[in-house]
Amino acid sequence: MKNLKKKLTLTGLMTAGLLFLSGCVQTHVVDGVRVPTEAATHGITYNFLVRPMSAFVDLFANNLHMGYGWGIIFVTLIIRFLILPLGLNQAYKSTYMQEKMAYLAPVFAPLQERLKKAQTPEEKMAAQQALMAAQKDNGINMLSSIGCLPMLIQWPFFIALYNAAAYTTGISSSTFYGIPLGHPSVVLVIISGVLYFIQTWISTLSMTPEQKKSGMAMLIMSPAMIVVFSFMSPAGVALYWAVGGFVIVIQQIIITFIMKPRMRRRIDEEFTKNPPKINNEGLKDVTPTSVQENFKEITSERNEKERKSGGRNAGKQNRK
């Protein structure tokens, strides 16, 4: 039931985000082509976001004679790489807290077990408070990892890019290597879906088994939603999704293979110097293993693995 709720919540958030992108500019169909309404062209969103981005696309398409397909590609690449540091900053905060939670999961396990086995409302409340206090004492604050500011800064660019790719004058009548940009393209839909699948697959490579259980939903839903919306949109929008997917794959590679290993080393150092703080006072003891023993066991296993890994690496270096 909990997994189902997570999947439904995730699907709802993704759908809301995609609908938000497309719904910021009101449109209607004129001569078989969907264009912004007269009222929308005088609105704040169109004039301050979409119109400048459309002019940027026109710069590459007409002034530099590259065509609208390459115009969408270059503008999307430029904007996405400009805001890439914001995306990495947001990912760093959320990923750091997730890695910290994963590291401390064996330590919090007895407290969570006590919470499950608590029988009276008083015991449940006391166990919940103890768990929250333990998380606070060990620097766990999931709200601080959300990173609303970077997300808010990025959204106007996403809105502008999406609507510029969809409604810039001239795109609907243009082609890109034989693909009509004003009509859905199966080729671009497949490319978009594959790129977003690769991104989510890379994100699972460094996950713990527990994280993978929830991550598998994202592995399927993220590319599926992109495929559905790309298929329902003109090829110009699907091209925007595909280029954006390419940048997201690069971002995910940085997160998985550069940021996460550094985070784990940092977390190891933090808790080696300052072991987890757990206050067991006032709790009904329903688990035989203490928190500190559990922590020592998990850290000793991790240190043993690191020593074996270090020994193998050292042997390889000596043979060289």
UniProtKB/Swiss-Prot annotation:
GO molecular function, one term: membrane insertase activity
Domain of life, per lineage: Bacteria
Composition bias type Basic and acidic residues, residue spans: 294-309
Name of this chain's protein: Membrane protein insertase YidC 2
Location of this chain's protein in the cell: Cell membrane
Region feature (Disordered): 270-320
Residue positions of covalent lipid attachment, annotated as N-palmitoyl cysteine: C24
Family: Belongs to the OXA1/ALB3/YidC family. Type 2 subfamily.
Record's keyword annotation contains Phosphoprotein: no
Lineage: Bacteria, Bacillati, Bacillota, Bacilli, Lactobacillales
Membrane topology: Multi-pass membrane protein
UniProt KW Kinase keyword: no
Chain's role: Required for the insertion and/or proper folding and/or complex formation of integral membrane proteins into the membrane. Involved in integration of membrane proteins that insert both dependently and independently of the Sec translocase complex, as well as at least some lipoproteins.
Pfam families assigned to the protein according to its UniProt record, in alphabetical order: 60KD_IMP
An individual GO BP term: protein transport
Taxonomic source organism: Lactococcus lactis subsp. lactis (strain IL1403)
Cellular component terms per the entry's GO annotation: plasma membrane
Keywords, alphabetical: Cell membrane, Chaperone, Lipoprotein, Membrane, Palmitate, Protein transport, Signal, Transmembrane, Transmembrane helix, Transport
Signal peptide segment: 1-23
Lipidation positions, renumbered (S-diacylglycerol cysteine): C24
Transmembrane segments: 68-88, 142-162, 178-198, 217-237, 239-259
